[in-house]
């Protein structure tokens, strides 16, 4: 709102006030009203000028140029954001062309194999000791339910360097069928995902595998549905 508009509104407000007979109280009231109107217009004009010329307004946060004045935590956050991570990480995906088996590939879109992790004999080889997040997902698909009960399993196993024995780290079992599809009835499709994930202490040279029991039920219709990976913490 401009200053001229504010002055015009004040004048119209004064004209709208009822006229009273002149007297000591009426003169004093008119004097106070005029003084208030003047102060209101002057204050609004001053505020408008200060905002227009940028004298007041939102302040920008400024960081000190001297690094010693920045907190150690802030320095660590800023330096880590500029330094690439050297922690082992891998994300492999299933090969949709491998019929009857679950084969992992790292040379595919959205796959990753970095900082020492190896994919050997369909197993992930841990490059260094430490805590790791291990995860995997598979998606099963079928048409109708057969007479024999369908049990789907997904397991992540570890073969440690210290003892050459396969040990299950994570495992899950699901059954997509509650009852057999009646003869002559429509065989409806079903989908059953299984996700596994957990944090484990691993040693250098440990081998990890992600396996299933019924690979013929795997669904490769869309990418990113079947994967396996580890992330060093």
Curated annotation (Swiss-Prot):
Chain ranges on the Cytoplasmic side, renumbered to this chain: 1-35
Alphabetic keyword roster: Cell membrane, Cytokine, Disulfide bond, Glycoprotein, Lipoprotein, Membrane, Myristate, Phosphoprotein, Secreted, Signal-anchor, Transmembrane, Transmembrane helix
Residues bearing glycans: 80
Localisation: Cell membrane
Any GO BP: necroptotic signaling pathway
GO MF: cytokine activity; tumor necrosis factor receptor binding
Residues bearing PTM Phosphoserine: 2
Pfam families to which the protein is assigned, alphabetical: TNF (PF00229)
Site positions per UniProt: Cleavage: 34-35, 39-40, 49-52, 76-77
Membrane topology: Single-pass type II membrane protein
Highest taxon above the source species: Eukaryota
GO cellular component: cell surface; extracellular space; plasma membrane
Major subcellular location class: membrane
Topology, Extracellular side: 57-233
Disulphide bond pairs: 145-177
Membrane-spanning ranges: 36-56
Record's comment on post-translational modification: The soluble form derives from the membrane form by proteolytic processing. The membrane-bound form is further proteolytically processed by SPPL2A or SPPL2B through regulated intramembrane proteolysis producing TNF intracellular domains (ICD1 and ICD2) released in the cytosol and TNF C-domain 1 and C-domain 2 secreted into the extracellular space.
Domain THD: residue ranges: 88-233
Residues carrying lipid (N6-myristoyl lysine): 20
Function: Cytokine that binds to TNFRSF1A/TNFR1 and TNFRSF1B/TNFBR. It is mainly secreted by macrophages and can induce cell death of certain tumor cell lines. It is potent pyrogen causing fever by direct action or by stimulation of interleukin-1 secretion and is implicated in the induction of cachexia, Under certain conditions it can stimulate cell proliferation and induce cell differentiation. Induces insulin resistance in adipocytes via inhibition of insulin-induced IRS1 tyrosine phosphorylation and insulin-induced glucose uptake.
Quaternary state and interactors: Homotrimer. Interacts with SPPL2B.
Family under the similarity heading: Belongs to the tumor necrosis factor family.
Protein name from the UniProt record: Tumor necrosis factor
Organism: Papio hamadryas ursinus (Chacma baboon)
């Amino acid at each position: 709102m401009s200053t001229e508009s504010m002055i015009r509104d004040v004048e119209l407000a004064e004209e709208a006030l009822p006229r009273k007979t002149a007297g000591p109280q009426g003169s004093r009231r008119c004097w106070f009203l005029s003084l208030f109107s003047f102060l209101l217009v002057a204050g609004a004009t001053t505020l408008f000028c200060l905002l227009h010329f940028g004298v007041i307004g939102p302040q920008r946060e400024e960081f000190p140029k001297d690094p010693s004045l920045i907190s150690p935590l802030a320095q660590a956050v800023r330096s880590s954001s500029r330094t690439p991570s050297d922690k082992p990480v891998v994300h492999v995906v299933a090969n949709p062309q491998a019929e009857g088996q679950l084969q992992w590939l790292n040379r595919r879109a959205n796959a990753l194999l970095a900082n020492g992790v190896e994919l050997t004999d369909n197993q992930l080889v841990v490059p260094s000791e430490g805590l790791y997040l291990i995860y995997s997902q598979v998606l099963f698909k079928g048409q109708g339910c057969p007479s024999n009960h369908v049990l789907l399993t997904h397991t992540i196993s570890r073969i440690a360097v210290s003892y050459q024995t396969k040990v299950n780290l994570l495992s899950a079992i699901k059954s997509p069928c509650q009852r057999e599809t009646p003869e002559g009835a429509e065989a409806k499709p079903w989908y059953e995902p299984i996700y596994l994930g957990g944090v484990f202490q691993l040693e250098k040279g440990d081998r990890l595998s992600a396996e299933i029991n019924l690979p013929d039920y795997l669904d490769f219709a869309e990418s990113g549905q079947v994967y396996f990976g580890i992330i060093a913490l």
